[in-house]
Curated annotation (Swiss-Prot):
Record protein name field: Argininosuccinate lyase
Amino-acid biosynthesis in keyword set: yes
Family, similarity comment: Belongs to the lyase 1 family. Argininosuccinate lyase subfamily.
UniProt cross-references to NCBIfam families, sorted A to Z: argH
Lineage of origin: Bacteria, Bacillati, Bacillota, Clostridia, Eubacteriales
GO MF entry, a single one: argininosuccinate lyase activity
Gene from which this protein is expressed: argH
Residues making up the signal peptide according to the UniProt record: none
Keyword Cytoplasm: yes
Keywords: Amino-acid biosynthesis, Arginine biosynthesis, Cytoplasm, Lyase
Length: 440
C-alpha cells in the first residue's frame, strides 16, 4: 500500500520503488514522526476537524506503534516508501479506516521537515553534552598535570607554557563550539508543521498550538520556506565540521606527543591498538581514526551543500538526500567526542620528559631579551644579542642558564647575577601577564 497512486494508470516499477525508498535510513526518525503526528492529531480535534473519539483511537494506535517499535515487537522494515508511510499504514492496519484521518491538513513535506528539525534539535543537544564531557576531562587532567612544557610555533620549541594551559586552549575551542551549537538551536527553533505541501492548508489549523506542543518557539513565517529550508542541517554539519577540526588538531598533538621522539604522554591501552606483525607496537589508533574521520564529516558538509545549491522552491525529492549526511555527521562527531574524552581522561603525562625538552630548546631566550630591555637596551638590540648567545650555546651544547656570568658579559655588560633568577623557567612563567597561565 502507498500513500498515493490514484492518478496513476500503471504500477511503479520495482526498480523505482527500491530507488525511491528511504526507509532504510529515515527509520531513525520514527520517534519524531510519531511525536509530530500525536501533536497534529491533538490540534485537529481542538479545531473541530476530527471528532474526540477519532482522536482517542488514533492516539492509542500511535502510542501502541511507538511502544511496539521500542520493544522490538514491530520491526521497521518492508516495502514502505518511507518512515511516514510505515507509521501511517501500520496505524490503519491497527485501528481501521479512522487511521486514514491522521494526514488531514498535512503533507509529507511539512511532516518530514518537522521530523528532521525535531531530530536535529535532539542530536544537537546530544553533541553539546558530549562536548561538556570532553571539556570537563580537559580541565581535570590539566589540573592534575600542571607541569612546565615547551610551547611551539611552526612545530619548533618557542616559549615555556604548561601542560594544563595547553589543554585549556582546546577547552576554549570546544567552548566556542558549544556556543555555536546553542546559537544554531535558537535559529532552528521554528516549527514547519502546518506549512502543508508548500501553501498551507484550507483547514483552520492552529500552528501556534502544535509549535508549542512540540517545544518550538514559534511556527515558521513562510510556508514555502518552511518545507524547503535545510539551512539548519547545513549549519549544524558545518559546526560539526569545526568540532572535528578541533578534535583533529588535538589528535595530531596527542599522536606526536605519544611517539618515541617526544614521549610527553602515554595513551592508555584502552584507546590504543597493536600490530599483527610487530609485537612491540602500541599504536594511537583512537586519535588517528578521529583525525581520519574529520574528512568524512567535511564530505557530509559538501554533500548537503551540493544537494541544495540549485533547488527551486519549494520541496524537491533531492531533499531526501539530506538525511544520510546529517545522520553520519552526527554519529561521527558524537563517537569521536566520546573517544577523545576517553583518551584524555586516561592518558599519563611524563613530567620529566616535558622538562627535558624545555631545557633543550632555549625557551627562556625571549625572557633573556626582556632582561636586557629592563636594563635599558632597545628590544631589537637585545634580540640580536640573545640570538648570538644562542649560537654560542649551540656550539657548546649548552643552555643559556648554564653559561657563566663571565661568558654572558662577553655579549653585553648589562648582564648581572640576577639574570639567572630572571630567566629561571618557573620564575619567568609567573612574571607579568604570564601569571594568567596559572602555573602553581
Amino acid at each position: 500500500m502507498k500513500l498515493w497512486g490514484g492518478r496513476f494508470k500503471e504500477e511503479e516499477s520495482k526498480l523505482m520503488e527500491d530507488f525511491n525508498s528511504s526507509l532504510s535510513f529515515d527509520k531513525k526518525l520514527y520517534y519524531e514522526d510519531i511525536k509530530g503526528s500525536i501533536a497534529h492529531v491533538k490540534m485537529l480535534v481542538n479545531q473541530d476537524i476530527i471528532k474526540e473519539e477519532e482522536k482517542e483511537k488514533i492516539l492509542l494506535g500511535l502510542e501502541g506503534i511507538l511502544k511496539e517499535i521500542d520493544g522490538g515487537i514491530l520491526k521497521i522494515e518492508g516495502d514502505y516508501e518511507d518512515i511516514h508511510s510505515f507509521v501511517e499504514i501500520n496505524l490503519i492496519n491497527k485501528i481501521g479506516d479512522v487511521g486514514k484521518k491522521l494526514h488531514t491538513g498535512r503533507s509529507r513535506n511539512d511532516q518530514v521537515a518537522l521530523d528532521m528539525k525535531l531530530y536535529a534539535k535532539k542530536s544537537t543537544e546530544e553533541v553539546i553534552e558530549c562536548l561538556k564531557g570532553l571539556m570537563d576531562s580537559l580541565i581535570k587532567v590539566g589540573n592534575e598535570n600542571n607541569y612546565i612544557m615547551p610551547g611551539y610555533t611552526h612545530l619548533q620549541r618557542a616559549q615555556v607554557v604548561t601542560f594544563r594551559y595547553h589543554l585549556l586552549a582546546y577547552f576554549e575551542m570546544f567552548k566556542r563550539d558549544e556556543k555555536r551549537l546553542k546559537n544554531a538551536l535558537e535559529i532552528l527553533n521554528e516549527s514547519p508543521l502546518g506549512s502543508g505541501a508548500l501553501a498551507g492548508s484550507t483547514y483552520n489549523i492552529d500552528r501556534e498550538y502544535t509549535a508549542k506542543l512540540l517545544g518550538f518557539r514559534k511556527p515558521v513565517d513562510n510556508f514555502l520556506d518552511g518545507v524547503s529550508d535545510r539551512d539548519y542541517i547545513i549549519e549544524l554539519i558545518s559546526k560539526f565540521s569545526i568540532i572535528m577540526m578541533h578534535l583533529s588538531r588535538l589528535s595530531e598533538e596527542l599522536i606526536l606527543w605519544s611517539s618515541s621522539e617526544f614521549r610527553f604522554i602515554q595513551i592508555g591501552d584502552a584507546y590504543s591498538t597493536g600490530s599483527s606483525i610487530m609485537p612491540q607496537k602500541k599504536n594511537p589508533d583512537g586519535a588517528e581514526l578521529i583525525r581520519g574521520k574529520t574528512g568524512r564529516v567535511y564530505g557530509d558538509l559538501i554533500s548537503i551543500l551540493t544537494v541544495m545549491k540549485s533547488l527551486p522552491l519549494a520541496y524537491n525529492k533531492d531533499m531526501q538526500e539530506d538525511k544520510e549526511p546529517f545522520f553520519d555527521a552526527k554519529d561521527t562527531v558524537i563517537s569521536c567526542l566520546k573517544v577523545m574524552e576517553g583518551i584524555i581522561s586516561t592518558l599519563k603525562v611524563n613530567k620529566e620528559n616535558l622538562m627535558k625538552s624545555v631545557k633543550k630548546g632555549f625557551l627562556n631566550a625571549t625572557e633573556a631579551a626582556d632582561y636586557l630591555v629592563n636594563k635599558g637596551m632597545a628590544f631589537r638590540d637585545a634580540h640580536k644579542v640573545i640570538g648570538e648567545i644562542v649560537i654560542y650555546c649551540e656550539d657548546k651544547n649548552s643552555a643559556i642558564e648554564d653559561l657563566s656570568l663571565e661568558e654572558l658579559k662577553q655579549f653585553s655588560d648589562l648582564f648581572c647575577e640576577d639574570i639567572y633568577e630572571f630567566i629561571d623557567y618557573k620564575n619567568s612563567i609567573n612574571k607579568g601577564i604570564k601569571k594568567e597561565m596559572g602555573y602553581f
